Structure formats: C-alpha cells, structure tokens
Design a protein with these regions (language model features):
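Conserved CoA-thioester-binding segment of acyl-CoA-metabolizing enzymes
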Residues: 1-63
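CoA-thioester-processing core
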Residues: 98, 102, 117-171, 200, ...
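Glycine- (often His-adjacent) and acidic-residue-rich active-site loop
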Residues: 28, 36, 56, 63-97
C-alpha cells in the first residue's frame, strides 16, 4: 500500500489484517463530484487499479466522509481544458477506467454508504455487499435531471438492480430511494445507524478475510463476471451517446 497510500488527493487509504478501507473525500470533507485533474472522476479509476494490483488486499471497503457518500457536484473543481470538446476525450477515458477498474478489483468489496449517494451511487451498489446508514438515500442526479445522458454505466447498473422498467423510471425521474426501501428492493443488504456502519463493515471484512485468498479471489471473479461482460458491451457505447448529446446542441440551442 505504501506506493499509493499518499498518491491521491481525494482518497484516503488504511488497512488492517488485509481489509483495505478507501475513504472518498473532497479537501478533507464530504466527497463531492468534480471534473478537474484532481477530482474523484479523475482519480478513482487509477486508484482501483492500484488496489487491484496489491496482493496484500483481501477485502476492500469503499465509503465516504462525514454525513455524505457523494451528494453534490464540486463547483470548485472546474475542468481545466478550454472547452467541453477538448475535455470529453479525457472524461470518456476516465469513465471507462472508473467502472471497469472497480469491477477488476479481484477481491470482495463492501460498500459502506454513510449518507446520501445522489451522484454516482453505482460506485456503492456495484460492491458485493452494500451496507447503508439510516440516513442514506440513492439517486442519479448527475444525468437526466441535469440535462445529461445517463450513459456512463448507470444505464446498465440500475436496470440490473431494479428491473428494466423501474430502473428506467429511476434514471429518467431522478427518484430518490431511501435506505429502507433500498433494502426492500434488494440492492442494500443491511441498514444501520451511522455510528454502527463502519464497525459492521469492518466486522464483515474481518470475517471474510479469514477465508483463503484464492477462495476470495475466485468468488469475486464469478460474482462480477456478468457485470464485467455487460460493461464491456455497453459502457463505451453509452459514453459515446452521452458525449454526443453534450457536444451537439439541440435544434434551437445552437
């Protein structure tokens, strides 16, 4: 872990007995989503690759900071390129790395959703075990509600989690799903008080970490096989649609 522990601006790492914790943040506070070269969008894909390559990791816990998982955009992190057209190739590459590298982590992942996950909640629900604080809620506010095509993987993830029709409704309307409803729908395993969330994640992590390393790795492989196949088939296409809609103004808006 020493080669990446202090490498990232938006992610803190700690590890005990093979259980790695990745804590997302923005300047030490709750994580916000931005598009700068030092944003979570830029860093997470690289971080997931570093984590995947570290054989000392037996379990990975992904969580946020304070009372929010990721609930808002970061206005202090604008993209550095002179225009959206100049930025989009980087954003597309980062988008591909973000979910593909998360799913390429070869050990089980636990998502500990410490508060609202309103932007890129798929990062949490793609984990093998999803725990949520009572105050957590899930939505996709970064795309259709904000005028963007939901093509960066959420178009694959949410219809898989919720079923085709409910998933499309969720993406089109910006529906917010609370923690208890998320558990009822099946994409959250346990709902806990915020103070009990990380201790429970660590308890589960320690329990799993006692299993043989190869058992964990091959179990993870079979559990995410279909997700990886779907991402391979659909992510590039979806990002292409998202970028096209951003770069080509609608009639009357040119």
């Amino acid at each position: 872990m020493s080669d990446y522990a202090d490498k990232y601006h938006c992610i803190n790492f700690s590890r005990a007995d093979g259980v790695l914790e990745m804590t997302m943040h923005s300047r030490g506070g709750p994580a916000k989503w931005g598009t700068s070269l030092q944003s979570l969008h830029a860093e997470l894909g690289h971080a997931f690759l570093d984590v995947a390559r570290d054989y000392e990791n037996k379990i990975v816990i992904l969580t946020g900071t304070g009372d929010s998982f990721i609930s808002e955009m970061d206005a202090e992190e604008p993209f550095p390129e002179p225009s959206l057209a100049h930025m989009w190739p980087r954003i597309q590459d980062e988008g591909l790395a973000l979910l593909n590298n998360l799913l390429a982590i070869p050990v089980p992942m636990i998502g500990a959703v410490n508060g609202p996950a309103l932007i890129h909640a798929e990062l949490a629900v793609l984990c093998d075990i999803v725990l949520a604080a009572e105050q957590a809620e899930f939505a996709d506010l970064a795309h259709v509600p904000g005028g963007a095509v939901p093509g960066d993987g959420v178009h694959t993830v949410w219809p898989m989690m919720l079923g085709p029709n409910r998933g499309r409704y969720f993406l089109l309307t910006g529906e917010r799903i609370g923690a208890d409803e998320a558990k009822r729908l099946g994409f959250v395993a346990e709902v806990l008080g915020r103070d009990a969330l990380l201790p429970r994640a660590r308890e589960l992590g320690a329990q799993l970490a006692r299993l043989p390393a190869l058992t964990l790795r091959h179990t993870r492989s079979v559990l995410v096989r279909e997700l990886r196949r779907r991402m391979f088939d659909e992510l590039s296409n979806g990002l292409g649609h998202e970028g096209l809609a951003m770069l080509c103004p609608s009639p009357g808006q040119a």
